Amino acid sequence: MNNILSEEVLNVTDFTTSRQLTLWKREDLQSSQLDDVAEEVPVALVYNGISHVVMMASPKDLTHFAMGFSLSEGIIDSPREIYGMDVVPSCNGLEVQIDLSSRRFMGLKARRRALAGRTGCGVCGVEQLNDIGKPVQPLPFSQTFNLGNLDRALKHLNDFQPTGKLTGCTHAAAWVMPSGELAGGHEDVGRHVALDKLLGRRATEGEEWRQGAALVSSRASYEMVQKSAMCGVEILFAVSAATTLAVEVAERCNLTLVGFCKPGRATIYTHPQRLIAD
């Protein structure tokens, strides 16, 4: 198999489709024109030849997605437990074929579940409600962040949404350095998928990605908190609100959860001791 950081095999340079649409504007007649629509395709994650999950996603950065999903769902503990990946077309979408260590594959088969293919849906396929909000090892308090640097990150978050700028249809997730600069980011039609792409990228980057926080352009659901905590992220910033279950999970696993992030303001839901306010 190819190295896990190899380029996707598909020659995809444009992740939108032009369609003839009808527009309506007040006091104007309807007009027809071409406009961009974001691509959304079924993506199957196939471990050692067995399909584990199908998600609806944007068809880019899929090896990062597969790595992040594997980590945030507890399929692996380390990127070293994945030996290689290939992205290949299938009859109805795309497959990420993952070469998983034998030990991890045995564990995966023991708890295998099939998730229905909704856009970034995290509850689909969970067999019992008790499986939601599974226990996460409490995070250490090793990170701090100066809220005065958050404005810089918010200003540049859209830089990682080129498809979103064309279509208004994607979510973004970016890694914020302590200085407020963005080390990198990813977008997707599904907010959970965008976060998984970021978490997968972070797992394969160097030490400069150890310090900082995750920033998402969406609301913060319980699953986004849980995924972040599973990958050792101590601080999660969200542009929109957090749900009650997200707050409960964040409190329980020692994650600092911040919502309604706007220039000059934010709402701190849990564990404010990591944050510095100048």
Curated annotation (Swiss-Prot):
Cellular-component GO terms for this entry: cytoplasm
Function, as annotated: Required for formate dehydrogenase (FDH) activity. Acts as a sulfur carrier protein that transfers sulfur from IscS to the molybdenum cofactor prior to its insertion into FDH.
Protein name listed in UniProt: Sulfur carrier protein FdhD
Record InterPro entries: Cytidine_deaminase-like, FdhD
A Pfam family per the record: FdhD-NarQ
Annotated positions binding Mo-bis(molybdopterin guanine dinucleotide): F260, C261, K262, P263, G264, R265
Domain of life assignment: Bacteria
PANTHER family noted in UniProt: FORMATE DEHYDROGENASE (PTHR30592), SULFUR CARRIER PROTEIN FDHD (PTHR30592:SF1)
Keyword Magnesium found: no
Gene Ontology biological process: Mo-molybdopterin cofactor biosynthetic process
Biological source species: Salmonella heidelberg (strain SL476)
Segment forming the signal sequence: none
Catalytic residue list: C121
Record family assignment: Belongs to the FdhD family.
Gene Ontology terms, MF aspect: sulfur carrier activity; sulfurtransferase activity
Principal location: cytoplasm
Entry's localization field: Cytoplasm
Alphabetized UniProt keyword annotations: Cytoplasm, Molybdenum cofactor biosynthesis
Keyword Cytoplasm included in the entry's annotation: yes
